[in-house]
Design a protein with these regions (language model features):
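Basic, flexible Lys/Arg- and Gly-enriched helix-loop patches that mediate nucleic-acid binding at interfaces
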Residues: 1-235
């Protein structure tokens, strides 16, 4: 079995992310650091990531976490900022986030040890819907709503059509519900910036079939069986 596939089956990361980890020199097989793709893993081999032995997980676990602003979704942070995974050090299995929420954003984050599901959900072909509640500076006009819906030019590439609905007009801000299926870096923030509106607060309220609901900020819960079925059936 290829090393990156083995890592995915251990729940470490998607194959694509596993390849990045290998290239960064974070993976060893039987004590030998691996940096090239194509390495085969045989039964009895000891694979370590960041010095920690990994093994395929037999029981898949799925957790919804309401990430607050001010936490990073990486496994560790060189700047010493608080990491999402700090909350799960004592969890029975090692969890990994499915995708990311940027440092200043909050909301629904899925964590799991199911590497195969992670890979499927993050693959561009599945176009997983991600819905955000954005509070932005100023008054968003209908012309700007139409621009956001049709696509905004970012890095010389137009964003895919988005679902956009104004929820509330405040004295100096607008609350907007936005659904996208792409995963560009800080995409929603940059889309609004291109229309002249700074994002004041951004919360992800839906991810695929999952709904954040009333889960308090900074709290987590395991998915219900119905929620797990909705994920595994579709993805």
């Amino acid at each position: 079995m290829r090393l990156q596939k083995y890592m995915a089956e251990c729940g470490v990361a998607s194959r694509r992310k596993a390849e990045e980890m290998i290239a960064q020199g974070r993976v060893t097989v039987n004590g030998v650091r691996i940096t090239e793709m194509g390495t085969q893993v045989e039964e009895g081999d000891e694979v370590c990531v960041d010095g920690q032995l990994i093994r395929p997980e037999t029981e898949k676990r799925y957790v919804m976490y309401h990430k607050p602003a001010g936490e990073v979704t990486t496994v560790s942070d060189p700047e010493g900022r608080k990491c999402v995974l700090d909350h799960f050090r004592d969890y029975p299995v090692r969890l990994y986030p499915v995708g990311r929420l940027d440092y200043d954003s909050e909301g629904l984050l899925l964590l799991t040890n199911d590497g195969a599901l992670t890979e499927r959900m993050l693959h561009p072909s599945h176009q997983v819907d991600k819905t955000y509640l954005a509070r932005v500076e100023g008054s968003v006009s209908m012309d700007e709503v139409r621009q956001l819906r049709s696509g905004i030019l970012l890095d010389d590439h137009k964003t895919a059509p988005a679902k956009v609905r104004v929820i509330k007009l405040e004295a100096y801000a607008t609350v907007v519900l936005v659904t996208i299926h792409e995963g560009r870096n800080r995409q929603v923030r940059r889309m609004f910036e291109e229309t002249g509106h700074r994002v004041l607060q951004l919360r992800r309220v839906q991810f695929g079939p999952l709904d954040l609901g009333e889960l308090p900020r900074g709290k987590w819960r395991e998915l219900t069986q119905e929620e797990v079925r909705s994920l595994t059936a579709y993805y």
